Amino acid sequence: MSRYLGRDIDLRLVFFIIDVESERYGALGMRIDRVINNNVVSAVEENGTEVVVMGKGVGFQMRHGMTIPEEQIEKVFRLDNPSSMDQFKNLVASLPPERLQISTEVIQYAKGVLNKKLSPNIYLTLTDHINFAIERFQEHMLFGNPLLREVRAFYKEEYMIGTFALDLIERRLGIAFPVDEAASIALHIVNAEYNTKMRDTIDITRIIQDVLDLVREYFQMELDETSLSYERLITHLRFLAQRIYTSETIDDDTGLSEFPGMIEQIYPEEYQCSRKVKEYIEKTYGHQVSEEEVAYLAVHLKRVRTQKGE
């Protein structure tokens, strides 16, 4: 069990959601187990699998054992671990249905923007986060996000998704969150993209910022954050930071064992800066950075220094 935003949530459960539109016939034969509210019910499929179903009025005047009309089903939530189903049902039952709807719409929007699959846990974690953020707002307890600047710079698409969520919440609920909350939501999306824990995502973001600060200090220059080369550097640093937590390294896949030495000769300043980054990572995190990694980073640093304003 993990303490998540003041609630006990088992993040080890395998959680997934299926759009009914993509599995229409799988919804046939669902029978009500328990009505959670007018728009959410727990149900049992013909094969005995317990699910949670969302749809406008799907629980209205329904009772245990009744078959759910297919046309009322909008979403079907399935947990691969049956013992964890109660946990999700309790979460859904404890919040107004519009908050689950908002979370689901934000996730669907994120999938479209990013054009990639997200970790299924996002339905659990983001719903809980939005619900808790609203509760804090109602209690006049608003907190800033110390990583706002970094999230804006490093995760632009995810931050845009966060602002979409804030706009949706304001339109639906009349609650206007500060932009810090967009950054918090963005970090949840990043978690789901790379299947990392929130603590790791925060640390990865700080590593990227620390490396950029080191680069700025080494070259005594400001980086052009609007350039394509800067975007490529951020992407490279993001994967480098993620490898710290997966204990992975980049090995030479060029077929040229002399690649690092060649880069050192061609880009000596960038290579030395890259070695400073290597020393920082190895000293701070105990993660070994290969010479190939040093060389690839040096190439990105050269691009950043020479390709401004792309």
Where are these regions (language model features)?
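Intrinsically disordered, low-complexity segments enriched in serine/proline and basic residues
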Residues: 2-3
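A cross-family "folded-core" feature that marks the main globular domain of proteins
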Residues: 15-310
